[in-house]
Amino acid sequence: EQVGSQAGGAYXM
């Protein structure tokens, strides 16, 4: 996720 959601993790933040 680009915003670092619970599904995508915080790698996009």
Swiss-Prot record:
Q: Where in the cell is it found?
A: Secreted, Cell wall
Q: Which organism is it from?
A: Nicotiana tabacum
Where does it primarily localize?
secreted
Give the UniProt entry's GO cellular component terms: extracellular region
Q: Sorted alphabetically, which keywords does the UniProt record give?
A: Cell wall, Secreted
> By what name is this protein known?
32 kDa cell wall protein
